[in-house]
Structure formats: structure tokens, C-alpha cells
Amino acid sequence: MAAAASLTEAFTQIGKEFESTKPGTTVTFNFGSSATLATQIEEGAPIDVFAAANPATMKTVTDVGAAEPPTNFVSNVLQIAVPKGNPGRITGLKDFADKSKKIAICAPQVPCGAAAAKVFSAAKITPAPDTLEQDVKATLQKVSSDEVDAALVYRTDVIAAKDTVDGFEFPEARQAANVYPIAVLKGSMNAAAAQQFVDYVLSADGQAVLRKAGFGKP
């Protein structure tokens, strides 16, 4: 299974639950940047299921005929993440344009970066990032390790890292909500089991795990 980095905690739990319902089945995940995973799929990597962090990335896979029709299964929004206690005294999105602040955002070619670009455009803010990361977990790590004063990451990532970061919402986030699609890949060597996993993700049990992690309805 190839899945967006922001799905790490939720899908790991779903994988364990799925395995318990299917004795003898082992689920192996490759979590990372949706864009990187899509490239791997397009190059023929042996993957059964792809869950992307936005429809545009999934479209690059379906456009080359590598996936069955996808189903949207959750949504996610950005939050401002700061180290515990907010030592940089970040108050809102405007601080991302303050060159005296250390800022991390996702690179523009990955879904969390594309969402960030929409947010900044809506807020009429030109960000001044100190680092552009290739996936949301790498961006979050900059906050967890106190390397930056703030970052834009998904709400679910703030929840997953609640022991090391604080997060807060901002109005423009809803204008850049990401919808996540999932699909069985046409080259799957385990198509039946792959479809069963997708069905489990879409089931009440799978959706309960995703809601607990902070994901919204698609």
C-alpha cells in the first residue's frame, strides 16, 4: 500500500485491524509524499493500493491508466503548528511573511504545499519560508525538533504530535481543504485483497479510525 505521509498513524491502525479480520494477510505500507509515490507507481513499482492527499496527484496515476476509478474517503485541513508553548510567539498566518520568524512549509509540488499556496493566496500573504519540505511529516519534524517557529501542516499531524507541538486553526484553511482519494492499482498482484482493504477503509470501522485521527468527511 502506498499512502500519503499524513495517513501514517491512521492507516497503520487500520492495517492492524484489517489483518485481524483477514488471518494470513499482511499489509505493508509505504508512506511518503503523494507526488513521489505517484511517480513510483507510474514507473511500475509493485503497489496494490494508492491513497493520495489530493485528487490532482491521483489524476496523474489514473491518466496513465495505472489505477481503477478512485473513491474519495476523507478530507483534511491545514493548521499552524508551533513548538509546545509557542516560543516564537506566533499569532497567525501573517507571521509566515515575517522574515524574523523561522518558518517551514511543504514544497509546492506536493499536496500540503499546494494547499498552503491556496491559503496564502486567499490571505494575500507572501510567505518567507526558511525551508521547503518534501512531505508533511518532514515539515512537522522541523517543529517537533524546535528548528522552526511555525509550520503549516495538516490538522491530523498536529493531533498525532500533540506531545511535542501545539496547533491552531485559521479562517483561510477551509478554502484549501484537501480531499483524499484511494484506488486499487491495475497492476496489483493481489487485486481481491486490495479491494477488500479499500472497502475496509470506507467501512464504518475504517472511517471511525480516520475520524479519531482528525480527518473529516470527503
Task: Annotate each predicted stretch with a short phrase.
Residues 1-21, 26, 35, 39-42, ...:
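Exported/periplasmic ABC-transporter solute-binding proteins
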Residues 79:
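N-terminal glycine-rich flavin-associated loop
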